[in-house]
Swiss-Prot record:
Record gene name: mnmG
Species of origin: Helicobacter pylori (strain J99 / ATCC 700824)
Entry GO MF terms: flavin adenine dinucleotide binding
Keyword NAD attributed: yes
Lineage: Bacteria, Pseudomonadati, Campylobacterota, Epsilonproteobacteria, Campylobacterales
Example GO BP: tRNA methylation
Primary residence: cytoplasm
Protein name: tRNA uridine 5-carboxymethylaminomethyl modification enzyme MnmG
Length: 621
């Protein structure tokens, strides 16, 4: 049977959900093919969304019309701001989720969205015509034709689950791997490599002894992810902290020879920032304990996820390890930990629109691109969906810059540098992180969302008013010169503030940590009518004014540099500071400008600086 749509999405995980929903929202006919409809939106690993860097991604996805934020706000069990004591640039919202509620909400959202149809089957191969994808075939002899195809297969491509010496061809425990599609992608000439990730054991909630464990509460004023969320008052459950100990470590050491990670059974590279417990014991042998979080998987608290105990050790060893830990001495394991090895395609095979360079109309998103994490997958799925629709409409792709969004950083890192380990987002990856805060996501991306038809006009108008109010009042504060007069000193004293000794503008005064929103309104009467969202932005902009201005200068400098032309017969060979790889790629593609050079995978900002210098030197000589 042959069926037709505008866009096909393969895979119903976090990337596939965002890709299919956003494309349907933008008015094209979308068909989602997934192995199991009931696992759409399943959180395969930890029961949480957000975190450092990841919270930024979730909020960016939300502003650009994505679903992850709103689903999380409907299914959260505990909400916290991580790094709350640090500056706003590095804070991250994180929520424990009810995995059942999240999955059901996501599935129903997909099933009830106009322009979006779903079928339960397995994609086996791509249909190509003149190096352009035109559809797929499935395991039940269906043929789907479409103008664009987005592949979001997660860990299912030639997936192998490892528990001790046992191996099974699964994409997730108990679910079939996608071997035919994996073979098809290899045959098409993509650069396919292997990665590994893992998950932690789960234990029955009624078998845990919580007495003596440290209770971990949510925030008193819980933060939420979606700007569309109203009247937010979630039920908050506690997590609990426990630790491994020397006995735990000895049990693991005694069984290193049975660990797939060390026996040579696993060849794929695992996530650097989420290592298995056996890897931690091996690499940090001097540590006497490792922190573990017991996290409820649902509101019923029937199962707890042991965060920090990712493992692929044999079943009997997992039993001994868990029973050696305080609070888990009599724990009943409901699901064992396991490692999974899977195919991914080097993301240097992609453009910044997430379209493959080899095959026109084919987009990749999520773990197939070498990333790890629900949020990273959602961000890529969203962008692939948007760009597939724009390509259908013969419009320019939507590319976010590194100075605009963490999504821009994520995609730029992937397509220019590639990866040899599962890539996850951190605030440290963003060189412009002072500009890319969670608190200003709406102001950063609202205009893009509105232009793409993904934000309501009335809301956007209010947002623009707020943005104008921020700019006007910052200008007014800069022009407001304060002197240590009797009146000024008296007012500062009444507010419990230290006196000023010299002239100072309003921005410098508000840079003080102690100057909260209430004091701002009290001292500067023109700030009284402003809403809290505007005041908060003014406060942050004042506090980091010098650094923010510096980052804007750097961006302007970079934008100016990228406009520099590269002479037609410019010789790249022999330039100190350019790697052999960079020289080979520059000679091969012969970019006409530094901007074109920046689009070549493997060309770094440092390479561009060197090129800029030598273009200037050779012009002058």
């Amino acid at each position: 049977m042959v069926k037709e749509s505008d866009i096909l999405v393969v895979g119903g995980g976090h990337a596939g959900i965002e890709a299919s929903l956003i494309a349907a929202k933008m008015g094209v006919r979308v068909h989602l093919i997934t192995m199991l409809i009931d696992t759409i939106g399943l959180a395969s690993c930890n029961p949480a969304i957000g975190g450092l860097g990841k919270g930024h991604l979730t909020k960016e996805v939300d502003v650009l019309g994505g679903a992850m934020g709103i689903i999380t706000d409907h299914s959260g069990l505990q909400y916290r701001v991580l790094n709350a004591s640090k500056g706003p640039a590095v804070r991250g919202t994180r929520a424990q989720i009810d995995m059942d509620t999240y999955r059901i909400f996501a599935r129903n959202l997909v099933l009830n969205t106009p322009n979006l149809s779903v079928s339960q089957e397995m994609t086996e191969s791509l249909i190509l015509e003149n190096d352009e994808v035109v559809g797929v075939t499935t395991n039940i002899n269906n043929t789907y034709r479409a103008k664009k195809v987005i592949i979001t297969t997660g860990t299912f491509l030639k997936g192998v689950v490892h528990i001790g010496e046992h191996q099974n061809q699964n994409g997730r425990f108990g679910e079939n791997a996608s071997n035919s599609l994996a073979l098809n992608l290899r045959e098409l000439g993509f650069k396919v490599e292997r990665l590994k990730t893992g998950t932690c054991p789960r234990v029955a909630g009624n078998s845990i002894d919580f007495e003596g464990l440290e209770e971990h509460f949510g925030d008193a004023n819980p933060p939420y992810f979606s700007y569309k969320t109203k009247d937010f008052n979630p039920t908050q459950l506690s997590c609990f902290i426990t630790y491994t100990n020397p006995i735990t470590h000895q049990i693991i050491r005694d069984n290193f020879h049975r660990a797939p990670l060390f026996s040579g059974q696993i060849e794929g590279i695992g996530p650097r920032y989420c290592p298995s417990i056996e890897d931690k014991i091996n690499r940090f042998s001097e540590k006497e304990r490792h922190q573990l979080f017991l996290e409820p998987q649902t509101i019923h608290k029937s199962e707890y996820y042991i965060n920090g105990l990712s493992t692929s050790l044999p079943l009997d060893v997992q039993e001994k390890v868990i029973h050696s830990i305080k609070g888990l001495e009599n724990a009943l394991i409901t699901r064992y930990g396991y490692a999974i090895e899977y195919d991914f395609i080097q993301p240097t095979e992609l453009t910044h629109a997430l379209e493959t360079k080899k095959i026109k109309g084919l987009y990749l998103a999520g773990q197939i691109n070498g990333t790890t994490g629900y949020e990273e997958a959602a961000a890529q799925g969203l962008m692939a969906g948007i760009n597939a629709v724009l390509a259908l409409k013969n419009q320019a792709p939507f590319i976010l810059k590194r100075n605009e969004a963490y999504i821009g950083v994520l995609i730029d890192d992937l397509v220019t540098k590639g990866t040899n380990e599962p890539y996850r987002m951190f605030t440290s990856r963003a060189e412009y992180r002072l500009l890319l805060r969670e608190d200003n996501t709406l102001f950063r991306l609202g205009e893009h969302a509105y232009r793409l038809g993904l934000m309501e006009q009335d809301f956007y108008k209010e947002l623009e008013k707020d943005k104008q109010a921020i700019q006007e009042n910052l200008k007014r504060l800069k022009e407001c010169v304060l002197t240590p007069s009797k009146e000024v000193l008296k007012r500062l004293n009444e507010l419990g503030e230290n006196p000023i000794n010299d002239k100072m503008d309003g921005v410098s005064l508000l840079a003080r940590d102690s100057f909260n929103l209430e004091k701002m309104r009290s001292f500067f009467s023109f700030l009284v009518p402003l809403n809290e969202r505007v005041l908060e932005q003014i406060k942050i902009e004042c506090k980091y004014n010098i650094y923010i201005e510096k980052q804007h200068e750097n961006i302007a400098k970079m934008d100016s540099m990228l406009k520099v032309s590269i002479p037609k017969h410019f010789v790249f060979k022999g330039i100190p500071g350019l790697s052999l790889e960079a020289v080979e790629k520059l000679e091969k593609f012969r970019p006409k400008s530094l901007f074109e050079a920046s689009e070549i995978s493997g060309i770094t900002p440092a390479n561009l600086d060197v090129l800029h210098l030598y273009i200037h030197l050779r012009k002058n000589s």
